[in-house]
Amino acid sequence: MGQKIHPTGFRLAVSRNWASRWYANNNNFAAMLQEDIGVREYLKKKLKNASVGRVVIERPAKNARITIFSSRPGVVIGKKGEDIELLKTELQRRMGVPVHVNIEEIRKPETDAQLIADSITQQLERRIMFRRAMKRAMQNAMRLGAQGIKIMSAGRLNGIEIARTEWYREGRVPLHTLRADIDYATSEAKTTYGIIGVKVWVYKGDTLGRNDAPVVEEVTEDKRPRRNARPGDRRPRRDGEGGAPGARRGGPRRGAGKPEDGKTGE
C-alpha cells in the first residue's frame, strides 16, 4: 500500500531549509542532535500557551542562536522581558554555551500547519466534535489565503471502540510537486479514550525556494562556416560558381564560340 513521504524532508535543499542549521563531525553529531530534540521538547512544554509554530536552532562558533516563531510573542517575552530572560538562562544551562533567543511573529496563524494541528488537538481534548474542529480550521485557512488544505485524524474518534481514520481536503494539495510550498505538521490529543493523532498539510502556492531562480544561459548561434558543406549547399564557392547539383555552371557552352571569318554555321 502506498505511503505518504514527509513533505518537509522531501523538499529540503529544494524549497525548504533545515530547522537545525549547524555542522558537526561524526563524534559530536549524535549528542548535538539529541540536544536539539531536548530543547524543542522543553520549549513546546514551556510555551504551550504561546502558540509556537516552529523553532530554528543555529550554532555559530561556540554559541547558540534560537529563533522561536510564535503568533503570540508577548506571551513568550512576558512582562518587561522577565520570561524571556528566565528562558534564556534555562537554555544556557541545558546547552552549556551562550544562547541568543530571537522571537519572530507569525502573521497568519490560521495558515500555519503546526498551529492548526495544535488548535484541533486542544479542541479534541475539550470534547469538541472532531468534524466540527476540522471543518472550522479548513474554512479559516482557505479564507486567509491558503490554496489548499488537508487534515487527517486517527484514533478512537468520538470515543468509539474501534479506531479509524478520517480526513477532509479542500482545494489543491500537490504533494509530489517540488516547487509547491507545502507546510506539514503533526500533533497528538491525549483524551480519556486514548491518543488521537492529527496531521495537517497546507498548500500555500508555488515557490522556487530561497528565491534562487534558475539562471538560463543564452545560447548564441555559431556563425562560423562549416568545414564540410552538404551536397545541396547553395552558398557561393571560391571559384565564384554555385548552385544546386545538376545545375549548369557559368561560362560559354562548348562549340558556342564566335564563328570564324568567312564561315557560317550550318
Curated annotation (Swiss-Prot):
Keywords: Ribonucleoprotein, Ribosomal protein, RNA-binding, rRNA-binding. CDD domains: KH-II_30S_S3 (cd02412). Residues 230-241, 257-266 have a biased composition (Basic and acidic residues). Residues 214-266 are annotated as: Disordered. Residues 39-107 form the KH type-2 domain. Binds the lower part of the 30S subunit head. Binds mRNA in the 70S ribosome, positioning it for translation. Belongs to the universal ribosomal protein uS3 family. Part of the 30S ribosomal subunit. Forms a tight complex with proteins S10 and S14. This is Small ribosomal subunit protein uS3. It comes from Burkholderia mallei (strain ATCC 23344).
